[in-house]
Regions:
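Conserved alpha-helix/loop element of class I SAM-dependent methyltransferases that forms part
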Residues: 61-116
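Conserved class I S-adenosyl-L-methionine
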Residues: 116-126, 142, 251-287
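Conserved SAM-binding loop of SAM-dependent methyltransferases across substrates and taxa
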Residues: 127-137
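Conserved SAM/SAH-binding beta-strand->alpha-helix loop
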Residues: 147
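S-adenosyl-L-methionine
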Residues: 159-207
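A short acidic, Gly/Pro-enriched loop at the edge of an enzyme's catalytic core
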Residues: 202-221
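A short glycine-rich, Lys/Arg-flanked "PGG" loop and its adjoining helix->strand segment in the class I
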Residues: 234-246
Length: 351
């Protein structure tokens, strides 16, 4: 959850009913509301194929709301955990092909089944969509967010499995929608998944020293679209040293949208002349803390669908990174289109 750079408090814009509505839509999209047909953006032919109807959608615009970003980042981490012993150090010039076949074979064999003894932490969990998806693999998932409103909503979703919200149309006008937890194994799996989740209010920059309060260390940690929206991102990284088990994974997805509105310039990770590109700066920061960056190519390919698989970002130095599309719908005709760089790190030494 974004914070104010001067105080570290939750940014006021995110503690509103409108923010809750937008994030419910992002975390729990339905078939009818993710594809644009509800707004007349797309028509279908007799075979049900989508055709454009007067709206030329940008590549990560309305057509890409189907990517369901919170579920996608969780799916990547679930698969990375299932193949963690096969993940190799990332090649600076690309991910290569060496172990892809082994990873794909493992994913087919294990089918990302539940690891009852494994624990996952979702830092900046918002309204809980990623946490519920992680709970399809991990025996315990703790979601932490600085927003009391978001955590209250996540707990309601945990109890009831659904919640009504409003999609704005014009000003105060809008229509009622329903957010639902939709486990990949079907509605019957909801109770078991919900029971594995625990949602708590907490500051992402103040997790250091909280291992005991959180019940011990974690096998996997998700940090999704958070680093560039907190006042002290390095404190988030510092906490990972004690929060993550040896050989545990940290999956970080970030658009690196650095702004002094949220983060003082001196706290940015990359984004300055002296530091260079943020993905490389983050890699260096994680190296200092005992984490090595690992290859995600086969894992991302298994989690994503066409045409998103080919989305890559190349740094000035030529290093390639997968980017994951995220679309936040503000109202019927306005979308935030975000491409988050995906990086995964394995802890290589004990703290």
């Amino acid at each position: 959850m974004p914070s104010d750079a001067s105080t570290g408090a939750v940014a006021p814009a995110y503690e509103t009913n409108d923010a809750v509505d937008m994030y419910l839509r992002l975390h729990y999209p339905s078939e009818s509301t993710t594809r644009g047909e509800a707004f007349g953006y797309f028509a279908t032919d007799d075979d049900g194929r989508k055709i454009h109807d007067g709206f030329d959608a940008p590549r990560c615009g309305p057509a890409y709301t189907e990517t369901r970003f919170p579920s996608l980042v969780a799916e990547v981490l679930r698969r990375a955990h299932a193949t963690r012993d096969l993940l190799r150090r990332k090649n600076p010039r690309g991910d290569g092909e060496d172990d892809d076949a082994d990873i794909q074979r493992r994913l087919r064999e294990v089918s990302v089944r539940v690891d009852a003894s494994a624990r996952a932490l979702d830092i900046g969990c918002a309204v809980g969509g990623s946490a519920f998806r992680l709970a399809e693999t991990f025996g315990e998932v703790i979601g932490v967010d600085a927003s009391e409103m978001f955590i209250d909503v996540a707990k309601k979703m945990q109890t009831d499995g659904e919640l009504k919200y409003t999609l704005r149309a014009f000003g105060d006008l809008g229509r009622e929608c329903v957010a639902r937890v939709s486990p990949s194994e079907g509605a019957d799996a909801f109770k078991a998944i919900a029971a594995r989740c625990d949602f708590r209010v907490g500051d992402a920059c103040a997790l250091g020293g909280q291992v005991d309060a959180l019940g011990g260390r974690f096998d996997a940690v998700l940090v999704s679209n958070l680093l560039c929206r907190v006042a002290e991102p390095r404190k988030v990284l510092d906490a990972l040293v004690e929060l993550v088990e040896e050989e545990g994974l940290v999956f970080i997805a970030s658009p690196f949208s650095w702004s002094e509105e949220y983060t003082p310039r001196e706290e940015w990770i990359g984004g300055t002349e002296s530091q260079g590109d943020s993905p490389l700066a983050l890699k260096l920061e994680m190296d200092k803390r005992g984490f090595v960056e690992v290859c995600l190519k086969a894992v991302v390919a298994d989690a994503m669908v066409e045409p998103e698989k080919g989305l890559l970002y190349h740094t000035a130095g030529g290093e390639a990174y997968h980017v994951l599309p995220c679309t936040i719908q503000e109202h019927e005709r306005k979308f935030q289109c975000i491409l988050s760089v995906a990086q995964c790190f394995k802890k290589t030494r004990a703290s």
